[in-house]
Design a protein with these regions (language model features):
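Acidic, glycine-enriched active-site microenvironments
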Residues: 1-168
Length: 168
């Protein structure tokens, strides 16, 4: 499983994350952080950008499942990235919509999204718990990177060298 999330406050700083899970456990070596360049289109465009950048690394093994933190718009933009790399039908795609508490699966006909299957969260389900764990980890990792970028921009004089000299 690869889970993706975007963290931002406005459009100035946008951070993205990818966390990898293998056999139901986090695989730290598969974690990636992305500074998102796209400023137009919000989270859906950010998701598409980081997926395009990740999928361009053909030397990395593609996952069996991509989990998107977001609803229909984010998942549809992720689908566009899969389509560009010819991975529709080869890599499963799910959206994890927190507001509506639904798991979204695009229904694909002739390589296009024809509709959506929606499944309510089943908190007792082991499958749901695994998806939730992956989504929470992607969210945590994106937030952590966002804060790191924000601190560098807000407090540029307090880099690692200055901190090590005790001048903060």
């Amino acid at each position: 499983i690869e889970a993706y999330d975007i963290a931002n406050l406005g459009r100035n700083i946008v951070a993205g994350s990818l966390v990898g899970f293998i056999e139901g456990k986090p695989e730290k070596s598969a974690y990636r952080q992305f500074k998102v360049a796209t400023r137009i289109g919000g989270d859906p465009s950010g998701i598409k950008e980081i997926l395009l950048r990740r999928l361009a690394h053909r030397e990395w093994v593609y996952p069996q499942l991509i989990l998107i933190d977001g609803g229909q718009a984010q998942t549809a933009f992720a689908f566009q990235a899969l389509k560009k790399f010819g991975l529709v039908g080869k890599v499963a795609l799910l959206g994890f919509a927190k507001r509506s508490q639904t798991i979204l699966i695009p229904v694909v006909v002739k390589n296009e999204i024809a509709g959506w299957k929606r499944f309510p969260y089943l908190a007792a389900s082991p499958a749901y718990q695994l998806l939730r764990q992956a989504q929470d980890e992607a969210h945590r990792f994106a937030q952590r990177y966002y804060k790191k970028i924000h601190q560098k921009i807000t407090f540029p004089a307090f880099g690692p060298k200055r901190k090590s000299k005790g001048r903060n």
